[in-house]
Amino acid sequence: MTTIATATLPKNVQYPQYDRSQLRSRIVHFGFGAFHRAHQALLTDRVLNNVGGDWGICEISLFSGDTLMSQLREQDHLFTVLEKGADGNQPIVIGAVHECLNARLDSLAAIIEKFCEPQVAIVSLTITEKGYCIDPATGKLDPTHPRIIHDLENPTLPQSAPGILVEALARRRERGLPPFTVLSCDNIPDNGHVVKNAVLGMAEKRSPALADWIADNVSFPGTMVDRIVPAATPESLAEIATVLGVDDPCAISCEPFIQWVVEDHFVAGRPAWETAGVQMTDDVLPWEQMKLRMLNGSHSFLAWLGYLAGHAHISDCMRDDVFRRAARQLMLDEQAPTLTITGVDLLACADSLIARFSNPALKHRTWQIAMDGSQKLPQRMLDGIRVHLARDSRWPLLALGVAGWMRYVSGTDDAGQTIDVRDPLVDKIRLRVAQSDEQQRVDALLGLEEIFGRDLPHNAQFVAGIRAAWQQLATHGAREAVARALNS
Protein backbone atom coordinates (compact mmCIF):
# COMPACT_ATOMS: atom_id res chain seq x y z
CA MET A 1 0.00 0.00 0.00
CA THR A 2 1.32 3.43 -0.93
CA THR A 3 1.44 5.93 1.95
CA ILE A 4 3.08 9.29 2.57
CA ALA A 5 6.09 7.31 3.84
CA THR A 6 6.61 5.58 0.47
CA ALA A 7 5.08 7.93 -2.10
CA THR A 8 6.99 10.56 -4.07
CA LEU A 9 5.34 13.74 -2.84
CA PRO A 10 5.03 17.05 -4.74
CA LYS A 11 7.98 19.43 -4.42
CA ASN A 12 5.97 22.02 -2.49
CA VAL A 13 5.47 19.59 0.42
CA GLN A 14 7.81 20.31 3.35
CA TYR A 15 9.39 17.03 4.48
CA PRO A 16 11.57 16.22 7.53
CA GLN A 17 15.17 17.29 6.87
CA TYR A 18 16.66 15.43 9.85
CA ASP A 19 17.70 11.85 10.58
CA ARG A 20 14.58 10.25 12.09
CA SER A 21 16.58 7.15 13.06
CA GLN A 22 18.22 9.24 15.80
CA LEU A 23 14.90 9.95 17.53
CA ARG A 24 14.10 8.49 20.93
CA SER A 25 10.82 8.70 22.81
CA ARG A 26 11.88 11.52 25.09
CA ILE A 27 8.38 13.03 25.09
CA VAL A 28 5.38 10.84 25.86
CA HIS A 29 2.13 12.50 24.87
CA PHE A 30 -1.42 11.74 26.02
CA GLY A 31 -3.98 12.46 23.30
CA PHE A 32 -3.11 12.24 19.60
CA GLY A 33 -5.84 14.70 18.66
CA ALA A 34 -6.08 17.29 15.92
CA PHE A 35 -4.71 20.15 18.00
CA HIS A 36 -1.62 18.31 19.18
CA ARG A 37 -0.78 17.23 15.64
CA ALA A 38 -0.95 20.78 14.29
CA HIS A 39 0.66 22.45 17.31
CA GLN A 40 3.11 20.76 19.71
CA ALA A 41 4.10 17.98 17.31
CA LEU A 42 4.61 20.47 14.49
CA LEU A 43 6.70 22.83 16.63
CA THR A 44 8.84 19.94 17.88
CA ASP A 45 9.31 18.87 14.25
CA ARG A 46 10.37 22.43 13.45
CA VAL A 47 13.02 22.26 16.20
CA LEU A 48 14.37 19.01 14.76
CA ASN A 49 14.56 20.58 11.30
CA ASN A 50 16.37 23.61 12.73
CA VAL A 51 18.87 22.07 15.16
CA GLY A 52 18.49 18.28 15.00
CA GLY A 53 18.50 16.17 18.15
CA ASP A 54 16.73 13.10 19.50
CA TRP A 55 13.52 14.64 20.88
CA GLY A 56 11.03 12.15 19.47
CA ILE A 57 7.43 11.78 20.65
CA CYS A 58 5.61 8.62 21.69
CA GLU A 59 1.87 9.09 21.21
CA ILE A 60 -0.50 7.50 23.74
CA SER A 61 -4.24 6.88 23.42
CA LEU A 62 -6.23 5.05 26.06
CA PHE A 63 -9.90 4.58 25.26
CA SER A 64 -10.13 5.31 21.55
CA GLY A 65 -7.91 6.10 18.62
CA ASP A 66 -6.95 2.51 17.83
CA THR A 67 -7.86 2.95 14.15
CA LEU A 68 -5.91 6.22 13.93
CA MET A 69 -2.90 4.65 15.66
CA SER A 70 -2.96 1.67 13.28
CA GLN A 71 -3.02 4.06 10.34
CA LEU A 72 -0.16 6.09 11.83
CA ARG A 73 1.97 2.95 12.14
CA GLU A 74 1.25 1.98 8.54
CA GLN A 75 2.82 5.26 7.37
CA ASP A 76 5.92 5.13 9.58
CA HIS A 77 4.41 7.58 12.11
CA LEU A 78 4.39 10.39 9.55
CA PHE A 79 1.37 12.65 9.09
CA THR A 80 0.52 15.83 7.23
CA VAL A 81 -0.49 19.28 8.46
CA LEU A 82 -2.04 21.52 5.80
CA GLU A 83 -1.71 25.18 6.76
CA LYS A 84 -4.56 26.98 4.99
CA GLY A 85 -4.14 30.69 4.45
CA ALA A 86 -6.25 33.19 2.56
CA ASP A 87 -3.44 33.42 -0.01
CA GLY A 88 -2.67 29.71 -0.38
CA ASN A 89 -1.87 26.46 1.39
CA GLN A 90 1.33 24.87 2.70
CA PRO A 91 1.48 21.08 3.25
CA ILE A 92 3.98 19.92 5.90
CA VAL A 93 4.84 16.30 6.68
CA ILE A 94 5.61 15.92 10.38
CA GLY A 95 8.28 13.42 11.41
CA ALA A 96 8.67 14.08 15.15
CA VAL A 97 6.51 11.12 16.21
CA HIS A 98 8.77 8.14 16.93
CA GLU A 99 6.22 5.55 18.06
CA CYS A 100 2.68 5.17 19.38
CA LEU A 101 0.87 2.99 21.91
CA ASN A 102 -2.82 2.29 22.29
CA ALA A 103 -4.51 0.44 25.15
CA ARG A 104 -6.51 -1.72 22.73
CA LEU A 105 -3.74 -2.42 20.24
CA ASP A 106 -1.03 -2.90 22.85
CA SER A 107 -1.88 -2.94 26.55
CA LEU A 108 -2.26 -0.61 29.49
CA ALA A 109 0.75 -2.31 31.07
CA ALA A 110 2.89 -1.46 28.04
CA ILE A 111 1.74 2.14 28.20
CA ILE A 112 2.63 2.54 31.88
CA GLU A 113 6.03 0.93 31.32
CA LYS A 114 6.73 3.39 28.49
CA PHE A 115 6.55 6.24 31.03
CA CYS A 116 9.21 4.44 33.06
CA GLU A 117 11.88 4.31 30.38
CA PRO A 118 14.96 6.29 31.48
CA GLN A 119 15.06 8.63 28.46
CA VAL A 120 11.52 9.98 29.04
CA ALA A 121 11.92 13.62 30.12
CA ILE A 122 8.49 15.16 29.42
CA VAL A 123 4.96 13.80 29.63
CA SER A 124 2.63 16.17 27.81
CA LEU A 125 -1.15 16.13 27.61
CA THR A 126 -4.01 17.30 25.39
CA ILE A 127 -6.91 15.47 27.03
CA THR A 128 -9.42 18.36 27.41
CA GLU A 129 -10.85 19.57 30.72
CA LYS A 130 -12.69 16.30 31.27
CA GLY A 131 -9.53 14.21 31.24
CA TYR A 132 -8.06 15.70 34.41
CA CYS A 133 -10.94 14.45 36.60
CA ILE A 134 -11.09 17.75 38.48
CA ASP A 135 -14.13 18.94 40.43
CA PRO A 136 -14.89 22.35 38.84
CA ALA A 137 -16.34 23.67 42.10
CA THR A 138 -13.12 23.04 44.09
CA GLY A 139 -10.37 22.85 41.48
CA LYS A 140 -9.21 19.66 43.19
CA LEU A 141 -9.29 16.00 42.17
CA ASP A 142 -12.86 14.70 42.05
CA PRO A 143 -12.90 11.64 44.36
CA THR A 144 -16.36 10.68 43.06
CA HIS A 145 -15.23 10.36 39.44
CA PRO A 146 -15.70 6.71 38.36
CA ARG A 147 -12.18 6.41 36.96
CA ILE A 148 -10.64 7.93 40.09
CA ILE A 149 -12.61 5.50 42.26
CA HIS A 150 -11.33 2.66 40.06
CA ASP A 151 -7.73 3.88 40.21
CA LEU A 152 -7.70 4.23 43.99
CA GLU A 153 -8.93 0.63 44.26
CA ASN A 154 -6.54 -0.59 41.52
CA PRO A 155 -3.51 1.75 41.69
CA THR A 156 -1.27 -0.46 39.53
CA LEU A 157 -3.93 -0.77 36.79
CA PRO A 158 -5.07 2.85 36.45
CA GLN A 159 -7.50 4.10 33.80
CA SER A 160 -7.33 7.88 34.32
CA ALA A 161 -4.58 10.26 33.29
CA PRO A 162 -3.90 11.29 36.93
CA GLY A 163 -3.80 7.63 37.96
CA ILE A 164 -1.40 6.67 35.18
CA LEU A 165 0.91 9.61 35.88
CA VAL A 166 1.06 8.81 39.60
CA GLU A 167 1.68 5.10 39.01
CA ALA A 168 4.43 5.90 36.50
CA LEU A 169 6.09 8.35 38.89
CA ALA A 170 5.80 5.85 41.74
CA ARG A 171 7.60 3.23 39.66
CA ARG A 172 10.32 5.68 38.61
CA ARG A 173 10.86 6.59 42.27
CA GLU A 174 11.08 2.92 43.29
CA ARG A 175 13.59 2.22 40.50
CA GLY A 176 15.78 5.22 41.27
CA LEU A 177 14.96 6.92 37.97
CA PRO A 178 14.73 10.72 37.71
CA PRO A 179 11.28 12.31 37.45
CA PHE A 180 9.83 13.84 34.31
CA THR A 181 8.15 17.19 33.64
CA VAL A 182 4.35 17.08 33.30
CA LEU A 183 3.30 19.55 30.60
CA SER A 184 -0.39 20.31 30.01
CA CYS A 185 -0.97 21.70 26.52
CA ASP A 186 -4.74 21.95 26.92
CA ASN A 187 -6.56 25.20 26.30
CA ILE A 188 -7.75 25.61 29.88
CA PRO A 189 -6.93 28.30 32.43
CA ASP A 190 -3.95 27.72 34.70
CA ASN A 191 -3.38 24.35 33.06
CA GLY A 192 -0.15 23.71 34.94
CA HIS A 193 -1.92 23.99 38.28
CA VAL A 194 -4.85 21.92 37.03
CA VAL A 195 -2.67 18.93 36.19
CA LYS A 196 -0.59 19.46 39.34
CA ASN A 197 -3.72 19.40 41.51
CA ALA A 198 -4.90 16.24 39.75
CA VAL A 199 -1.58 14.43 40.17
CA LEU A 200 -0.91 15.51 43.75
CA GLY A 201 -4.53 14.82 44.71
CA MET A 202 -4.20 11.26 43.45
CA ALA A 203 -0.75 10.79 45.01
CA GLU A 204 -1.88 12.04 48.42
CA LYS A 205 -4.64 9.45 48.48
CA ARG A 206 -2.10 6.72 47.69
CA SER A 207 0.88 7.76 49.80
CA PRO A 208 1.78 11.07 51.49
CA ALA A 209 5.47 10.23 51.02
CA LEU A 210 4.96 9.74 47.29
CA ALA A 211 3.03 13.01 47.10
CA ASP A 212 5.88 14.82 48.87
CA TRP A 213 8.43 13.34 46.43
CA ILE A 214 6.36 14.44 43.44
CA ALA A 215 5.85 17.94 44.88
CA ASP A 216 9.60 18.28 45.45
CA ASN A 217 10.87 16.77 42.20
CA VAL A 218 8.29 17.08 39.41
CA SER A 219 7.54 20.34 37.59
CA PHE A 220 4.21 21.34 36.05
CA PRO A 221 4.86 24.33 33.75
CA GLY A 222 1.91 26.38 32.57
CA THR A 223 1.37 26.88 28.85
CA MET A 224 -0.72 29.05 26.54
CA VAL A 225 -1.58 27.46 23.21
CA ASP A 226 -3.08 29.21 20.19
CA ARG A 227 -3.93 27.86 16.77
CA ILE A 228 -7.30 27.33 15.12
CA VAL A 229 -7.49 23.64 14.20
CA PRO A 230 -10.87 22.40 12.97
CA ALA A 231 -11.68 18.71 13.36
CA ALA A 232 -10.87 16.58 10.34
CA THR A 233 -13.75 15.89 7.96
CA PRO A 234 -14.04 13.67 4.88
CA GLU A 235 -13.86 16.86 2.82
CA SER A 236 -10.66 18.12 4.50
CA LEU A 237 -8.98 14.71 4.16
CA ALA A 238 -9.98 14.54 0.48
CA GLU A 239 -8.49 17.99 -0.11
CA ILE A 240 -5.20 16.96 1.52
CA ALA A 241 -5.11 13.74 -0.53
CA THR A 242 -5.47 15.83 -3.67
CA VAL A 243 -2.57 18.07 -2.58
CA LEU A 244 -0.32 15.09 -1.74
CA GLY A 245 -1.38 12.67 -4.45
CA VAL A 246 -1.88 10.01 -1.76
CA ASP A 247 -4.28 9.48 1.14
CA ASP A 248 -3.22 10.46 4.65
CA PRO A 249 -5.92 9.43 7.17
CA CYS A 250 -3.94 11.07 9.99
CA ALA A 251 -3.77 14.48 8.29
CA ILE A 252 -5.20 17.69 9.68
CA SER A 253 -5.85 21.20 8.37
CA CYS A 254 -5.30 24.41 10.32
CA GLU A 255 -4.70 28.14 10.00
CA PRO A 256 -1.18 29.53 9.39
CA PHE A 257 -1.05 31.38 12.74
CA ILE A 258 0.59 29.53 15.63
CA GLN A 259 1.63 30.61 19.13
CA TRP A 260 2.89 28.74 22.16
CA VAL A 261 3.95 30.40 25.41
CA VAL A 262 5.60 28.04 27.93
CA GLU A 263 6.86 28.54 31.47
CA ASP A 264 10.51 27.51 31.38
CA HIS A 265 10.50 25.13 34.36
CA PHE A 266 11.69 21.69 33.20
CA VAL A 267 13.32 19.15 35.52
CA ALA A 268 14.85 16.87 32.86
CA GLY A 269 15.55 19.09 29.87
CA ARG A 270 13.43 20.06 26.87
CA PRO A 271 13.69 20.61 23.11
CA ALA A 272 15.02 23.99 22.00
CA TRP A 273 11.47 25.13 21.29
CA GLU A 274 12.56 28.76 21.19
CA THR A 275 14.29 28.00 17.87
CA ALA A 276 10.81 27.28 16.48
CA GLY A 277 9.35 30.56 17.70
CA VAL A 278 7.99 29.35 21.04
CA GLN A 279 7.98 32.04 23.74
CA MET A 280 9.62 30.77 26.92
CA THR A 281 8.60 32.80 29.97
CA ASP A 282 8.53 32.86 33.77
CA ASP A 283 4.77 33.47 33.99
CA VAL A 284 2.23 32.37 31.40
CA LEU A 285 -0.87 33.61 33.25
CA PRO A 286 -1.24 37.06 31.58
CA TRP A 287 -0.87 35.49 28.12
CA GLU A 288 -3.35 32.77 28.95
CA GLN A 289 -5.90 35.23 30.29
CA MET A 290 -5.63 37.34 27.13
CA LYS A 291 -6.11 34.35 24.85
CA LEU A 292 -9.02 32.83 26.78
CA ARG A 293 -10.99 36.07 26.87
CA MET A 294 -10.02 37.80 23.61
CA LEU A 295 -9.91 34.78 21.27
CA ASN A 296 -11.81 31.98 22.97
CA GLY A 297 -14.47 34.22 24.49
CA SER A 298 -15.33 35.81 21.15
CA HIS A 299 -15.10 32.40 19.44
CA SER A 300 -17.70 30.97 21.83
CA PHE A 301 -19.86 34.10 21.45
CA LEU A 302 -19.87 33.60 17.68
CA ALA A 303 -20.39 29.84 17.99
CA TRP A 304 -23.48 29.93 20.24
CA LEU A 305 -25.16 33.00 18.79
CA GLY A 306 -24.00 32.39 15.23
CA TYR A 307 -25.33 28.83 15.31
CA LEU A 308 -28.68 30.05 16.64
CA ALA A 309 -28.81 32.54 13.77
CA GLY A 310 -28.07 29.88 11.15
CA HIS A 311 -24.34 30.44 10.51
CA ALA A 312 -22.58 27.10 9.96
CA HIS A 313 -18.99 28.39 10.12
CA ILE A 314 -17.10 31.13 11.95
CA SER A 315 -16.15 32.64 8.58
CA ASP A 316 -19.89 32.88 7.80
CA CYS A 317 -20.31 34.93 10.98
CA MET A 318 -17.48 37.18 9.83
CA ARG A 319 -19.26 37.84 6.54
CA ASP A 320 -22.24 39.08 8.55
CA ASP A 321 -21.43 42.67 9.51
CA VAL A 322 -23.49 42.47 12.71
CA PHE A 323 -21.51 39.52 14.07
CA ARG A 324 -18.19 40.87 12.79
CA ARG A 325 -18.67 44.20 14.58
CA ALA A 326 -19.95 42.45 17.70
CA ALA A 327 -16.90 40.19 17.96
CA ARG A 328 -14.52 43.14 17.70
CA GLN A 329 -16.53 45.25 20.15
CA LEU A 330 -16.67 42.34 22.60
CA MET A 331 -12.89 41.99 22.48
CA LEU A 332 -12.01 45.67 22.83
CA ASP A 333 -14.82 47.12 24.95
CA GLU A 334 -15.65 44.25 27.31
CA GLN A 335 -12.79 41.72 27.39
CA ALA A 336 -9.63 43.83 26.97
CA PRO A 337 -10.39 46.08 29.99
CA THR A 338 -10.44 43.01 32.26
CA LEU A 339 -6.89 41.88 31.36
CA THR A 340 -3.70 42.33 33.39
CA ILE A 341 -1.19 41.84 30.55
CA THR A 342 1.14 44.75 29.74
CA GLY A 343 3.22 45.60 26.70
CA VAL A 344 0.77 44.07 24.21
CA ASP A 345 -1.13 46.07 21.58
CA LEU A 346 -4.65 44.78 22.22
CA LEU A 347 -6.09 46.75 19.29
CA ALA A 348 -3.68 44.99 16.93
CA CYS A 349 -4.51 41.71 18.66
CA ALA A 350 -8.23 42.21 18.01
CA ASP A 351 -7.61 43.09 14.36
CA SER A 352 -5.48 39.96 13.97
CA LEU A 353 -8.19 37.78 15.52
CA ILE A 354 -10.87 39.19 13.24
CA ALA A 355 -8.65 38.41 10.24
CA ARG A 356 -8.06 34.86 11.51
CA PHE A 357 -11.77 34.28 12.13
CA SER A 358 -12.50 35.52 8.59
CA ASN A 359 -10.28 32.90 6.91
CA PRO A 360 -12.75 31.17 4.54
CA ALA A 361 -10.43 28.24 3.92
CA LEU A 362 -10.77 26.83 7.44
CA LYS A 363 -14.48 25.93 7.52
CA HIS A 364 -14.44 25.92 11.34
CA ARG A 365 -17.93 24.84 12.34
CA THR A 366 -19.83 26.85 14.93
CA TRP A 367 -21.32 23.57 16.16
CA GLN A 368 -17.85 22.18 16.94
CA ILE A 369 -16.79 25.28 18.88
CA ALA A 370 -20.13 25.33 20.73
CA MET A 371 -19.41 21.91 22.27
CA ASP A 372 -18.59 21.51 25.97
CA GLY A 373 -19.80 25.01 26.80
CA SER A 374 -20.22 24.21 30.49
CA GLN A 375 -16.44 23.71 30.68
CA LYS A 376 -15.63 26.83 28.65
CA LEU A 377 -18.07 29.45 29.90
CA PRO A 378 -16.39 30.18 33.28
CA GLN A 379 -12.97 31.21 31.99
CA ARG A 380 -14.06 32.63 28.64
CA MET A 381 -16.87 34.89 29.88
CA LEU A 382 -17.79 34.59 33.55
CA ASP A 383 -14.38 35.57 34.94
CA GLY A 384 -14.46 38.76 32.86
CA ILE A 385 -18.01 39.50 34.00
CA ARG A 386 -16.85 39.24 37.62
CA VAL A 387 -14.32 42.00 36.91
CA HIS A 388 -17.06 44.19 35.43
CA LEU A 389 -19.36 43.56 38.39
CA ALA A 390 -16.61 44.61 40.80
CA ARG A 391 -16.05 47.81 38.79
CA ASP A 392 -19.74 48.43 38.06
CA SER A 393 -18.92 48.69 34.34
CA ARG A 394 -21.09 47.61 31.40
CA TRP A 395 -21.02 44.14 29.79
CA PRO A 396 -24.01 43.81 27.41
CA LEU A 397 -22.28 41.54 24.86
CA LEU A 398 -20.94 39.22 27.54
CA ALA A 399 -24.46 38.97 28.93
CA LEU A 400 -25.71 38.08 25.47
CA GLY A 401 -22.99 35.45 25.16
CA VAL A 402 -24.06 33.76 28.40
CA ALA A 403 -27.72 33.93 27.43
CA GLY A 404 -26.77 32.63 23.98
CA TRP A 405 -25.25 29.56 25.60
CA MET A 406 -28.46 29.08 27.56
CA ARG A 407 -30.55 29.31 24.38
CA TYR A 408 -28.17 26.94 22.60
CA VAL A 409 -28.29 24.22 25.28
CA SER A 410 -32.07 24.58 25.44
CA GLY A 411 -31.88 22.64 22.20
CA THR A 412 -33.63 24.66 19.47
CA ASP A 413 -32.20 27.26 17.08
CA ASP A 414 -33.95 30.39 15.80
CA ALA A 415 -35.39 28.45 12.85
CA GLY A 416 -36.97 25.90 15.17
CA GLN A 417 -34.45 23.17 14.31
CA THR A 418 -33.25 20.75 16.99
CA ILE A 419 -29.65 21.25 18.16
CA ASP A 420 -27.39 18.25 18.84
CA VAL A 421 -26.01 19.52 22.16
CA ARG A 422 -22.70 17.92 23.21
CA ASP A 423 -21.57 18.67 26.76
CA PRO A 424 -20.21 16.74 29.77
CA LEU A 425 -23.13 18.12 31.82
CA VAL A 426 -25.73 17.47 29.13
CA ASP A 427 -27.89 15.25 31.37
CA LYS A 428 -28.03 17.86 34.15
CA ILE A 429 -28.69 20.59 31.59
CA ARG A 430 -31.49 18.67 29.88
CA LEU A 431 -33.16 17.98 33.21
CA ARG A 432 -33.18 21.67 34.11
CA VAL A 433 -34.40 22.62 30.63
CA ALA A 434 -37.20 20.06 30.82
CA GLN A 435 -38.29 21.24 34.27
CA SER A 436 -38.44 24.95 33.37
CA ASP A 437 -40.41 27.08 30.95
CA GLU A 438 -38.96 30.05 29.04
CA GLN A 439 -39.56 32.42 31.93
CA GLN A 440 -37.80 30.14 34.42
CA ARG A 441 -34.96 28.97 32.16
CA VAL A 442 -32.31 31.49 33.23
CA ASP A 443 -32.78 30.81 36.93
CA ALA A 444 -32.88 27.05 36.31
CA LEU A 445 -29.54 27.04 34.49
CA LEU A 446 -27.94 29.50 36.91
CA GLY A 447 -28.44 26.77 39.50
CA LEU A 448 -25.59 24.79 37.94
CA GLU A 449 -22.99 25.63 40.58
CA GLU A 450 -20.19 23.88 38.70
CA ILE A 451 -20.56 26.55 36.01
CA PHE A 452 -21.73 29.71 37.77
CA GLY A 453 -20.29 29.13 41.23
CA ARG A 454 -22.02 30.27 44.36
CA ASP A 455 -21.49 34.00 43.84
CA LEU A 456 -23.03 34.84 40.48
CA PRO A 457 -26.52 33.33 41.00
CA HIS A 458 -26.84 35.52 44.11
CA ASN A 459 -25.61 38.70 42.43
CA ALA A 460 -28.72 40.70 41.55
CA GLN A 461 -26.94 42.73 38.86
CA PHE A 462 -25.64 39.60 37.15
CA VAL A 463 -28.98 37.80 37.24
CA ALA A 464 -30.80 40.87 35.89
CA GLY A 465 -28.28 41.23 33.06
CA ILE A 466 -28.64 37.61 31.94
CA ARG A 467 -32.45 37.72 32.21
CA ALA A 468 -32.55 40.85 30.05
CA ALA A 469 -30.26 39.29 27.44
CA TRP A 470 -32.35 36.10 27.44
CA GLN A 471 -35.48 38.14 26.84
CA GLN A 472 -33.83 39.90 23.89
CA LEU A 473 -32.99 36.53 22.34
CA ALA A 474 -36.45 35.13 23.00
CA THR A 475 -38.15 38.18 21.51
CA HIS A 476 -35.91 39.08 18.57
CA GLY A 477 -33.72 36.07 17.78
CA ALA A 478 -29.93 35.95 17.92
CA ARG A 479 -28.95 38.22 15.02
CA GLU A 480 -31.33 41.06 15.93
CA ALA A 481 -30.43 40.76 19.61
CA VAL A 482 -26.74 41.11 18.73
CA ALA A 483 -27.51 44.14 16.54
CA ARG A 484 -29.45 45.75 19.39
CA ALA A 485 -26.64 45.07 21.87
CA LEU A 486 -24.19 46.83 19.54
CA ASN A 487 -26.29 49.97 19.73
CA SER A 488 -27.16 49.80 23.42
Cite the ranges covered by each PLM segment:
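Substrate/ligand-engaging "lid" and interaction regions
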Residues: 1-488
